[in-house]
Swiss-Prot record:
SUPFAM superfamilies: Pseudouridine synthase. The keyword Phosphoprotein does not apply. GO terms for biological process: tRNA pseudouridine synthesis. Homodimer. This is tRNA pseudouridine synthase A. Keywords: Isomerase, tRNA processing. It catalyses: uridine(38/39/40) in tRNA = pseudouridine(38/39/40) in tRNA. The keyword Isomerase applies.
Amino acid sequence: MDTAQKQRWAITLSYDGSRFYGWQKQADGVPTVQAALETALAQIAGEAVSTTVAGRTDTGVHATAQVVHFDTTAARPQQAWVRGVNAHLPEGIAVLHARQVAPEFHARFDAYGRHYRYLLESAPVRSPLLKNRAGWTHLKLDIEPMRRAAAYLIGEQDFSSFRAAECQAKSPVKTIYRADLTQSAGLVRLDLHGNAFLHHMVRNIMGALVYVGSGRLSVEGFAALIQERSRLKAPPTFMPDGLYLTGVDYPEAYGIIRPQIPEWL
């Protein structure tokens, strides 16, 4: 069919990252979020569908509000891209919203902000009920120095100290707008809002903050670590289990819905 007849759709989805080998589909056929989603979309579209995501997630990393766009010549009502697609998705993935968007909309390049939450359990014994849902440390954490340390993340900075060796980003300079830490019932929540994030950046930040909270790294040492701009001197990368992509920001004109973070999280 004529490509001029194609429609561009944006969908918001949630997924349990512990069930998949990351977002990106792989040649060896292991289960990934992208592969499962494109298979389900093709069932509704009656044609192959290729997706573009706001931000790829690694194995074990979850999303409550990931955004994807795709093009199709199939004329389907909005609910077909929600309920219809969900009927063909495996457990662990759900489409929350769908919206036809302007043909120039791009899920990745039009995003000007991203939100992440890291959920951390601090307890002598790891709860089996939180396995794959939260990170864990047996160490008792002092939240106040962790908050003071997190304040040093705010602003435009070179975050090379929290950048994975395999990161493909062109620049390590990113802007963090908000870095909040809260604690209740043995769970620590780190909320980060920034324009973009480096590979493993949130997990590396969490690893360093755990060092601060347990007394292995001072607040001043955390601040100095950022200025070092060297991953070699930083604490280890923290586990993926507790990391959630909780939102993506777009210009209002596109009408992309950003759901509230679920109360259970």
